[in-house]
UniProtKB/Swiss-Prot annotation:
Binds 1 [4Fe-4S] cluster. It catalyses: (2E)-4-hydroxy-3-methylbut-2-enyl diphosphate + oxidized [flavodoxin] + H2O + 2 H(+) = 2-C-methyl-D-erythritol 2,4-cyclic diphosphate + reduced [flavodoxin]. This is 4-hydroxy-3-methylbut-2-en-1-yl diphosphate synthase (flavodoxin). Pathway: Isoprenoid biosynthesis; isopentenyl diphosphate biosynthesis via DXP pathway; isopentenyl diphosphate from 1-deoxy-D-xylulose 5-phosphate: step 5/6. The keyword Metal-binding applies. Its EC number is 1.17.7.3.
Length: 405
């Protein structure tokens, strides 16, 4: 962890605690048409199985609002009780009022101050949602987005800034507008009677440096629980790297209580990728452990064979597949470290440092693969069945070390 931890209020969302000293929570969002109950339930189940601890769904029209209670019922049939967050823009006050069962079924409401209402209607419509949240004992995320920022507030801050002797840059004013919108909305929610421990706030942008600057300032100005993430991270490597860099820096500084990685999925790619990235960020920072880690070398001229890459892939896939049952049977197995190395240079050393590791022969080396367990050489594998034999050794290690004594 970093040199300090941003102490915040603790907010209960369904059965999940966010903020305070609680672990950083992984969130995700569906991209199905919410009124299609079957498809939405299927995707929520997949996201939850992948490790999402809270799932947000779009509630944008009456058919979506009417579907929410049915979605919750169907999830319960699968013994899935993941908290669902309703994502409201423009008409949340109307939908929550007209569909009280939707308001009851959701675990949290998300409001965007930039489009909850306009002109004289803004405060009234915001207040309607807050009062419904209070009546149903639900928390609220006040989520400000760069792309839908309150234009009246922004114009006012620009005018005030232009009158200053040493005006701020437009970028700094945008940062100020994001924070002001979030904090003023949160303050108004409290004035309406919503408790501080029912409020989570976020100020999302799409650029790494902007996100870091905004949240560093936001964390100094409040003690609300903070939802962290780029509002649109992008696709593929770009989206993953941008999210890992920005979230990693802030989390290392103790800023952020729950995260979502807003990736643009590649065509036909699983929605669960965003959950995997969240978990990898937290695990690589040492903040959470979800699944055994696999250390493997990148390969070089010494590792002319592709076998070490194939074995690494097989081991990783095996661990991921087994974790669904292992996490219930073997307490602590998620912290296990496995090494699959490709030659004698770093192979034995990395294998000894892992809980269990294998050092495969590189180019010109003897065709044998020593296996190290808890820092000591335990086996020597050779022949055509090294993959199967090593995976069997891993299985036995898990049972012996993490099984109930």
């Amino acid at each position: 962890m970093g040199s300090y931890m941003n102490k915040t209020s603790v907010v209960k969302v369904g059965n999940v605690l966010i903020g305070g000293d609680n672990p950083v929570v992984v969130q995700s969002m569906t991209d199905t048409y919410t009124a299609d109950v079957e498809k939405t339930v299927k995707q929520i189940l997949a996201l939850h199985k992948a490790g999402s601890e809270i799932v947000r769904i779009t509630v944008n029209d009456e058919s979506a609002a009417a579907a929410v209670p049915e979605i919750v019922k169907e999830l319960a049939k699968h013994d899935c009780h993941v908290p669902l967050v309703g994502d409201f823009h423009y008409n949340g006050h109307t939908l929550l009022s007209k569909y009280p069962e939707c308001a009851k079924a959701l675990a949290k409401y998300r409001i965007n101050p930039g489009n909850v209402g306009f002109g004289k209607k803004k405060d009234t419509q915001f207040a309607e949602i807050i009062k419904i949240a209070i009546a149903n004992d639900k928390p609220v995320r006040i989520g400000v987005n760069w792309g839908s920022l309150d234009q009246v507030l922004l114009a006012m801050l620009i005018d005030e800034n232009n009158a200053q002797e040493n005006p701020l840059s437009l970028q700094q004013i945008m940062h100020k507008a994001l924070i002001t919108s979030a904090l003023e909305s949160a303050k108004y929610a409290e004035e309406l009677g919503l408790a501080k421990d029912k409020i989570i706030i976020s100020c999302k942008v799409s650029e790494v440096q902007d996100l870091i600057a905004v949240y560093q300032k936001l964390a100094k100005e409040c003690d609300y629980a903070l939802h962290l993430g780029l509002t649109e991270a992008g696709m593929g490597t770009k989206g993953i790297v941008a999210s890992a860099v920005s979230l990693g820096i802030l989390l290392q500084q103790g800023i952020g209580n729950t995260i979502r990685v807003s990736l643009t999925p590649a065509p036909n790619a699983p929605r669960t990728e965003e959950v995997r990235v969240c978990r990898e960020i937290l695990q690589n920072l040492g903040m959470r452990t979800f699944t055994p880690s696999v250390t493997s070398c990148p390969g070089c001229g010494r590792t002319t064979s592709s076998f070490f890459r194939e074995l690494t892939s097989k081991v990783k896939d095996h661990l991921d597949e087994k974790m669904h049952t292992w996490k219930e049977q073997y307490h602590g197995v998620e912290a296990m470290k496995v090494a699959v190395m490709g030659c004698v240079v770093n192979g034995p050393g990395e294998s000894k440092n892992a809980d269990i590791g294998i050092s495969l022969p590189g180019s010109g080396e003897l065709p044998v693969a020593p296996v190290f367990i808890d820092g000591k050489k335990a086996h020597t594998l050779r022949g055509d069945n090294i993959s199967e034999e090593f995976i069997e050794i891993v299985e036995n290690y898990v049972k012996n070390r993490y099984g109930k004594k």
